Amino acid sequence: MGSRYIAVAALAAGTTLSAFSAQAAGDLNLICSADVVICEQMKGDFEKAHSDIKVNMVRLSSGETYAKIRAEARNPKTDIWWAGTGDPHLQAASENLTLEYKSPMLDQLQDWAKKQAESSGYKTVGVYAGALGWGYNTEIFKTKGFKEPKCWADLLDPAFKGEIQIANPNSSGTAYTALASLVQIMGEDQAYDYLKKLNANISQYTKSGSAPVKAAARGETAIGIVFMHDAVAQTAEGFPVKSVAPCEGTGYEIGSMSIVKGAKNLDNAKTWYDWALKPDVQSRMKDAKSFQLPSNKTAEIPKEAPRFEDIKLIDYDFKTYGDPAKRKELLERWDREISANAN
């Protein structure tokens, strides 16, 4: 059989959903919810390994992807969704938006990755994991005489007014994980009281989860609340960024992967799914400064990756906070009490 060809959508910040939709009859329609650099690397590596499959890919945050897949449920334009926090993947699974698939690679995965699959009825699977924290610009801290924030409580210091960025939890899985983590650490009412106080120090709620620490790296803000591996990536790029795991404890993500129910290129989606769980593929993620913990047991763990054993992790309740009703409840309250009063 000859090779099949489609026009490949440009993967860049300006890539539009309309461009994606217009080319949705191709060999594999993929949404990537990781950083654009690893998205590009994964796309290129897959096409080298499977030269007869051309990938039409768009980069979207996980909250945006969940909303898109939900809106297109009657006429899916996406085949597979790779990466992004696990909560929206679980929400999609619970709404029957994604397809049950038991990969032959399952036995090679870490327990937390397999548990993610089992809890969703095998409608999603863990591909990497990473803990929540923040990164701060050491040069700004030195210049302004700031004290290192070691705990969630420290971020409320009035000295940090206008010096912190975090993403919007409506669009960002990172920020939703932060919201859900604080609710689990403090209790819901106390968490929203905390977020109201923190709001005074927030200069911007970004669309993308990793954007806050990239802004800190560029000197545009002092602190970015992100997954710690995103902060480490900026340090590895040579920026003056130091990573912090909060002293009270923190949540974590299980970055996940799901096949969309009704995928028009199902066989190719399964090919990507199995390929993305291979140890050599996950070991290469560090080449894109992607320093998460890989889900394959034999994949190489990047030396830069923040290790779970060094971090005070909460027993994050993925089932509860991956429920669509709970997500809706938390986000509506965030919109009323936090977003409505944003600076």
Model features per residue range: what roles?
Residues 255-318:
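Mature extracytoplasmic/periplasmic domains
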Residues 33-40, 77-220:
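Extracytoplasmic ligand-binding site segments that recognize negatively charged/polar headgroups
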Residues 25-91:
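Early extracytoplasmic/lumenal segment of secretory-pathway proteins
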Residues 87-91, 217, 222-240:
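A ligand-binding cleft/hinge motif common to bilobed small-molecule-binding domains
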Residues 316-343:
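Conserved C-terminal helix/tail region of periplasmic/extracytoplasmic solute-binding proteins
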